[in-house]
Amino acid sequence: MIYTVTTTLPLSHGGRTQALLRRIKLLDEEFKILTTNYHGNYPSIYKKYRQENKVTENIQFENMYEWLSNFKLFKVPKTLITRNPKYIKTPRKIKGLIDKQGKKSGLIHYYNNECHVRSRKYYGQSNVLEYEDFISPTSGLKYERHQYNLYGQLHRKEYYYDDSSLKHSDELFDTEGSMYCKRYFKTKPNSKINGVEIYRNKKLYKTFKNDKLLAQFYFQNRFKNQDIVFNDARFLDKPLLKQTHQTKNILVLHSSHLSGDQIKKSYRFALNQSKNVYKYIVLTHQQKHDIQQHFHISDDQFQLVPHFIELDTEVEQDSSNNQNRFIYIGRFSTEKQIDHIIRAYHKFLQSGYQTELHLFGRDEDNQIPLMNTLISELKLSDKVKIFKY
């Protein structure tokens, strides 16, 4: 079997996910993509990928939490006779509470007299709940959130520290209402998982110190000897290379392995474990050369495969709307080194140029506040713009 493992498959995505999907589509063989993050509505993303022709029918998808739930996480409820999808609807009125429309579509806030005690978000104009927040009357912050899938089934409960927006734990439920996983989170940094409990038949089955060990357990149970496994996420290098099956592990390096002249911490394990790696796929000859300057890895373990883009020949160019600007599109994460882009742009302006820099992306590591601080320090607020993507 040929697998690709990655942490996430977002609906809106940049370079890494785009390159992953194009590689798989180009090969057009029977692939299974395994993801290890939690998402209660993954089937809707798979459907969108197929509608947009990003994957072929040869591609299968599986999520780690789907497997942990014994494949009950994404089970679609059906009506008894026609077997059509069944939607659980929740009235928008709550007895004894005053409701007020929120700023977002489908968002309603509920008040006990003047005290905000609950909020609900519905999917569009339907009566299918997306989430429900329970609000502390003393702090005004939510202390608990219930999340529902597209059919209105509860799939997660999140719990928050008192007087804080930080989450301390969550509980994951299958479509039959059984809790199969409980996770605990650090307060710093970035609310990383620092404890996982797995339940079977309502009894504690296994525990893990973090989600890397959980991913290793998942891979150990899913792979067999001689499976071919592409890994596109550095977070999963250790779980993949520490599982004990004799798999052909192919590590795809989507960005630079260097931070200045030092090897990035996220790359060290993979590059130190070359005996367990079948191939490293790199972007450039220079990247291969740089890696071999630091690690004794043979030439035959490298394969050069640059990223590529598809040109849409049907789109007509409208020169009347051309804007003179640099554009970055991708994740706002530490590994992307957006600060380097901003500093390089600052040097560019010092040469007398006036082209603006526009940054499009999703904040993953709380980078936007740091970016805004740097932009202010360099007095670039009128030249650098940040947009959600």
Listing of model-derived features with the role each one plays in the protein:
Residues 368-389:
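Nucleotide-activated donor-binding/catalytic signature segment of Leloir-type glycosyltransferases, i.e.
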Residues 260-264, 308-324:
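Acidic anion/phosphate-binding donor-loop and adjacent secondary structure
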Residues 206-212, 216-236:
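Short N-terminal targeting/anchoring amphipathic segment
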Residues 237-238, 247-265:
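A short, histidine- and acid-enriched strand-loop-helix "catalytic/donor-clamping" loop
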Residues 274-302:
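A short, active-site helix/loop in glycosyltransferases that binds the activated sugar's phosphate group
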Residues 356-369:
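Glycosyltransferase donor-sugar binding loop
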Residues 317-336, 342-345:
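Conserved donor-binding/catalytic core segment of Leloir-type glycosyltransferases
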Residues 216-224, 256-280:
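Membrane-proximal helix-turn-helix segments that form the acceptor-binding/catalytic region
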